[in-house]
Amino acid sequence: MLELKPPLVLLSGPAGFGEYLKLMDHRYVGGVLLKTVTLHPKEGNPTPRMADSDFYVINRIGLENPGIHAFVENIPELPVPMIASLGGDSFEEYLEVARVFKKVADRFYAVEFNFSCPNVKEGGLSIVKNAEEWKKLLNTLRKELPDSFLIAKVGVEGIFVEDAAEFVMKTGWDGITLVNTVRGLHFEKDTMILGGLSGPVLKPIALRAVYEVKKRFPELFVIASGGVYSVKDAEEFLKVGADVIGVGSALFKDPGVVEEIGKYLLEVKR
């Protein structure tokens, strides 16, 4: 089982490549889940890329990243454990990204594969919808990275999280991140912004997902992702069995909340 002290990570996407650590006391951060990296560099989507309200954030970054080859040559040096995040648009791309990453895998605490980005044309979603292909990919990646702690990042669209968790367990993976953003739409005056929905509005969905998965597979490692903006939010995710609490879009609102949650997680008895 992966152990982080405190059991709190800055989530892939908002955390970038660890830049937000400069804004907080890293003693209260257990680790950083780095920005998702793909086989080829991605420029991301055109602006506007973000929109928010009191209850949600819509982002359509589009997995902007330098590509896996540039990434392995410029791995950030951070004072906390790093978890890599890898993505792809096809079976072959996921496999090639894993092969390149394998050269530096021992520098990371774990590696997450993003199978659920809603802001790019494919982003792994099409593979997850094809159960047999996804199971084949999970098996192949497990064999490619036999010594890594493997985490699958999934959403709630295209597959039931309990089924996704079962595939992850049966193929020898170690954990799952629940949940990624869901598709949303926001109007900024007359501009329509389509992207991934996150923030407080996502918390009830994420809580239910974590609850259902841990009820059925208590031994599966779960990173809770979705609407953690306060100590109370973190407490509720612990109650449904989350092993690690992820903080994402809250970083845009108030990075200071990370220290508050981190202090709580260091003190709480589990």
Swiss-Prot record:
GO cellular-component term (any)? cytoplasm
Listed binding positions for substrate are K35, N59, R60, I61, G62, L63, N114, N180, T181
InterPro entries associated with the record: Aldolase_TIM, DHO_dehydrogenase, Dihydroorotate_DH_1, Dihydroorotate_DH_1_2, Dihydroorotate_DH_cat, Dihydroorotate_DH_CS
Q: Report the Pfam families cross-referenced here.
A: DHO_dh (PF01180)
Where it mainly occurs, coarsely classed, is cytoplasm
The pathway noted for it is:
Pyrimidine metabolism; UMP biosynthesis via de novo pathway; orotate from (S)-dihydroorotate (NAD(+) route): step 1/1
Its Enzyme Commission number(s) read 1.3.1.14
Superkingdom field: Bacteria
Where in or outside the cell is it found?
Answer: Cytoplasm
User: What broad class of enzyme is this?
Assistant: oxidoreductase
Question: What Gene Ontology molecular-function terms does this entry list?
Answer: dihydroorotate dehydrogenase (NAD+) activity; dihydroorotate dehydrogenase activity
Residues bound to FMN are S12, K35, T36, N114, K153, V179, G199, G226, G227, G248, S249
GO terms (BP aspect):
'de novo' pyrimidine nucleobase biosynthetic process; 'de novo' UMP biosynthetic process
* Requisite cofactors: FMN
Q: Which reaction does it catalyse?
A: (S)-dihydroorotate + NAD(+) = orotate + NADH + H(+)
Task: Give the UniProt family note.
Answer: Belongs to the dihydroorotate dehydrogenase family. Type 1 subfamily.
Descriptive protein name: Dihydroorotate dehydrogenase B (NAD(+)), catalytic subunit
Q: What is the lineage of its organism?
A: Bacteria, Thermotogati, Thermotogota, Thermotogae, Thermotogales
